[in-house]
Amino acid sequence: MRVMVDQDLCGTSGQCVLTLPGTFRQREPDGVAEVCVATVPHALHAAVRLAASQCPVAAIRVIESDAGDGERASADPAPSPAEAERHAAKDQHNLG
């Protein structure tokens, strides 16, 4: 999985950074979000989907990698926030 931020669309709310500070950061001085990783570790996939679903301006694009299907964008449909939170909590628990 890869993740991208449309920096022209980013509203600088920082929600993605609050959700996953190791994956997203806000650049100085304008606060636009940037991605910190080239490839998202499997353990953080659900949390990245959650961050994308919570972006108030839908500036985060998740690119799923599937060996049989190449890469496909999956900004829609996003999981419900409750479903994504359950998966993110499970992933975070598995990291510890």
From Swiss-Prot:
Keywords from the named record = 3Fe-4S, Electron transport, Iron, Iron-sulfur, Metal-binding, Transport
Question: What does the entry list as the binding residues for [3Fe-4S] cluster?
Answer: 10, 16, 55
What the entry lists under SUPFAM superfamilies is as follows: 4Fe-4S ferredoxins
Q: Which ranges are annotated Basic and acidic residues under compositional bias?
A: 83-96
Q: Where is this region: Disordered?
A: 67-96
Q: Which GO terms describe its molecular function?
A: 3 iron, 4 sulfur cluster binding; electron transfer activity; iron ion binding
User: What name goes with this protein?
Assistant: Uncharacterized P450-system 3Fe-4S ferredoxin blr2145.1
Task: Show the InterPro entries listed in the entry.
Answer: 3Fe4S_ferredoxin, Fe-S_cluster_ET
Q: Which Pfam families match?
A: Fer4_15
> What's this protein's function?
Electron transport protein for the cytochrome systems.
